[in-house]
């Protein structure tokens, strides 16, 4: 079984472009759930460029599946997570100047801080995931922090400019997923996945969940939000079924 986490950040981006109350990220999340989303992902960035603080509690109370909060490794974000108590937290690297998350968390470099955050979040019943590059040493370090989940960064695969590079990156993702599962980790993946490139990743049996946002929101402008979610989920399920 492959799960779909729908990232609703860019619904908030559209809302914030005009400073209005619409479109509502919460309404989008509820539509996504009815269309087959298994969880809702949102990223409260330090610059609040899309999701705002007020969105968190409303989202937590409204959705019926799981809330996956992406957050930077800062005390402010830890406090927010401990206040809202999402079911899941994914710790991600963050740079103010980037358009979107550009790479994986350096777990080896920030090991002690990550382990401390992980302990505090888990003490409140929150499942902790670390967003990392598909690298053996980062996976092993992630396991040693006490985190039970890793999310593999698929950006290099998604942005590959040639078939050979794409296949090389897919092999890295597949190998990393096997390493993670062998260590007892739950392995998720995401970043840059679209309707055109999702199936090879969804076919990797060791991967439990894919988190996808921009492609779904963009496609929703043409076909509607629920159909966009259903189409993505169908592609994922088809790929996993064919790989079985």
Swiss-Prot record:
Instruction: Cite the entry's keywords alphabetically.
Output: Cytoplasm, Pyridoxine biosynthesis, Transferase
Q: What class of enzyme is it?
A: transferase
Describe the reaction catalysed, as an equation. 3-amino-2-oxopropyl phosphate + 1-deoxy-D-xylulose 5-phosphate = pyridoxine 5'-phosphate + phosphate + 2 H2O + H(+)
The record's GO molecular-function terms, alphabetically, read: pyridoxine 5'-phosphate synthase activity
The record's SUPFAM superfamilies line, in alphabetical order, gives: Pyridoxine 5'-phosphate synthase
What's an example GO BP annotation here? Answer: pyridoxine biosynthetic process
Transferase among the record's keywords? yes
Residues recorded as binding 3-amino-2-oxopropyl phosphate, renumbered to this chain, are: 7, 18, 192, 213-214
Where, by residue number, does 1-deoxy-D-xylulose 5-phosphate bind? 9-10, 45, 50, 100
Where in the cell does this protein reside? Cytoplasm
* Residues flagged as site, Transition state stabilizer: 151
Its cellular-component GO annotations read: cytosol
Pathway assignment reads: Cofactor biosynthesis; pyridoxine 5'-phosphate biosynthesis; pyridoxine 5'-phosphate from D-erythrose 4-phosphate: step 5/5
Catalytic residues of the enzyme: 43, 70, 191
Record text on subunit structure and interactions: Homooctamer; tetramer of dimers.
User: Which family would the database say this protein is a member of?
Assistant: Belongs to the PNP synthase family.
Q: What does this protein do?
A: Catalyzes the complicated ring closure reaction between the two acyclic compounds 1-deoxy-D-xylulose-5-phosphate (DXP) and 3-amino-2-oxopropyl phosphate (1-amino-acetone-3-phosphate or AAP) to form pyridoxine 5'-phosphate (PNP) and inorganic phosphate.
Q: What is this protein called?
A: Pyridoxine 5'-phosphate synthase
Naturally occurring in which organism (per UniProt): Laribacter hongkongensis (strain HLHK9)
UniProt gene name = pdxJ
